[in-house]
């Protein structure tokens, strides 16, 4: 599913910065940049009908911590806007094409008190 998301993001002029970024405090499936925006993306796949579930509160917190770690380690400019997105990919049946839904601003992380966060 992440490979499909990477291809779709590239067509939309996003530049992939990291894939499966892991650190002790969490993980982010994809990190991409488009202009002055840094986007942290959770990718969900579902092989049957219905929406792929959005990440729960604990998983969102781990993604936010991993985003902060990424920004710190990569010395990301504090002038970049951060955004947390969800990409849902589904393949309802063998005969149907896969479906991709990109949900920008899937959750708000403005409560994060970190010098890197910019709402």
Indicate residue ranges for each PLM-predicted region:
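Active-site donor-binding loop signature of nucleotide-sugar glycosyltransferases
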Residues: 21, 43-45, 105
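Acidic-basic catalytic patches of nuclease active cores, encompassing PD-(D/E)XK
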Residues: 1-20
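Hydrophobic residues on conserved beta-strands that form the core of alpha/beta folds
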Residues: 16-18, 40, 84, 100
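Short strand-coil-strand connectors
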Residues: 22-24, 35, 94
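Domain-level recognition of nuclease-like catalytic cores that cleave nucleotide substrates
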Residues: 75-119
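Short beta-strand or tight-loop elements
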Residues: 12-13, 24-28, 80-82
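Mg2+/Mn2+-dependent nuclease catalytic core
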Residues: 46-69, 73
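Conserved catalytic cores of phosphodiester-cleaving nucleases, focusing on short active-site segments
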Residues: 28-50, 63
């Amino acid at each position: 599913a992440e490979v499909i998301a990477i291809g779709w993001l590239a067509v939309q002029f996003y530049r992939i910065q990291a894939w499966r970024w892991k650190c002790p405090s969490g993980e982010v499936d994809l990190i991409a940049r488009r202009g002055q925006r840094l986007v942290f993306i959770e990718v969900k796949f579902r092989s049957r009908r219905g929406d792929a579930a959005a990440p729960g509160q604990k998983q969102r917190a781990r993604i936010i911590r991993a985003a902060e770690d990424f920004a710190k380690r990569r010395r990301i400019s504090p002038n970049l806007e951060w955004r947390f997105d969800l990409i849902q990919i589904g393949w309802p049946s063998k005969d149907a094409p896969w479906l991709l839904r990109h949900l920008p601003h899937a959750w708000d992380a403005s409560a994060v008190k970190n010098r890197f966060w910019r709402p």
